[in-house]
Amino acid sequence: MNGKQQVTKKPSTEEDLSFTKFKVVPDVGLKSSQFEFVLGMPINQCIAMIQQHPRMLTKVELKYSKKDPFYQDIIIYIGSTGIRLYFDGLSQLIKLIEVDNLSMITLTYNDTIFSDPNNMATLDRVNEFFGSTHPGSYDDKHNIYVQSWPGLSFCFPYGGENSNLEVRPGFGGNLRSLKYDANSQPKLTKMSIYRGPNPSEPESVDTPFSCYCGQNRTRKVEAIWENGNIVGIDIQFDTQNGRIVDGEYDVSTYTRQIYFGDSVSDVQSILGAPTKVFYKSDDKMKIHRGLHKETLYGPPNFFFNYFVMGLDILFDFVSKRVVKFVLHTNAPGHCDFGMYSRCNFSIFLNDKQYEIRTDSKFDEFSHAFMNDSNPPRPVVLARQEQQPFGSTFCYGIKQIIVERTENGFLTSVTIYDGAKEK
């Protein structure tokens, strides 16, 4: 210890109550006065929101499968609220919201509190607030009684301190009802919000209008080939169109093409202004050019970063023309994870024999990168030593560079103008 003590300003009582008080919206999500978690929210938007409230949303854990990060769920648990968010591994959108610590949060429905840390909800109170529903189901394995409504379910324990509860047969299958006296009502232990009739198999959800915030969201990117060369990319994306539906701006889908050699104004007229403009301040390949060429290179090229689209576009500084596209997968475990939305792409190689997709593993198309049947040799992209994510490996063929992690999944695909220097 160095004798220093970190002092953190505690939020006021009003601030504390406002952020722990959430409105429950079945089939939609949880909403507070300062932020919301809704079904269909992209993971990078959720991470950004958590980072914007570091004093309120604390004890955050991120869990994912290292072996299969694209098809197993990604989970974010916010310990200070007891909220657990399940993201579909492929789409990276919230598909299930759980609250499993009711002592940390206040829940309301129709502007009335039905559970708070000092008076957690009982089965009777839940039924009173949410009305009649079908008989509940009983999980024999976990001794849990589940009461469900469309897009919403509540779990109550059975057994242990509640051993005086009696489970009665229902109308078939695992349907059951609980018998209990007024002094031993089961307390709510978990609430789930989802799309569809079954929380264990939530239906897929599109990004809601409220999450667009004036940004484009990519549906698919494909390469445009002409005479054996990639000349640009075809982008299908969703964007708000100005029409208002149910108090939110409506969304339309557009398909546009961006070519190598397009100007800055061409790109802005298609995609709008970028989230950020980034100037390349260093060039790690300069060492391969020789020291005598150091003065031959002028001002750096610059990127248009479209984080929400999972897309970067590089412009030549002198001509202000497009020379490169970078498509990001937002792979868990990569140092850029959470910065970009996932870009869904499908890049066929020239012979159409191999396809590079967002969820591809390098082994699926590695033969296309072989030279005279020899295994491809990667360029190792080493990050700073203090960061925990490790190195990635880059492989290149004509106009395409793929970057992958040790588990073989892709982190990015770069498409560059064959007429320009890489």
Curated annotation (Swiss-Prot):
One of its GO terms (biological process) is Golgi to plasma membrane protein transport. Keywords: Cytoplasm. Its main location: cytoplasm. The keyword Protease does not apply. GO terms for cellular component: cytoplasm; phagophore assembly site; striated muscle dense body; trans-Golgi network. The keyword Cytoplasm applies. It is found in: Cytoplasm; Preautophagosomal structure. May play a regulatory role in autophagic activity. PANTHER family: PHAGOSOME ASSEMBLY FACTOR 1 (PTHR13465:SF2), UPF0183 PROTEIN (PTHR13465). Belongs to the PHAF1 family. This is PHAF1 protein T01G9.2. The lineage of its organism: Eukaryota, Metazoa, Ecdysozoa, Nematoda, Chromadorea.
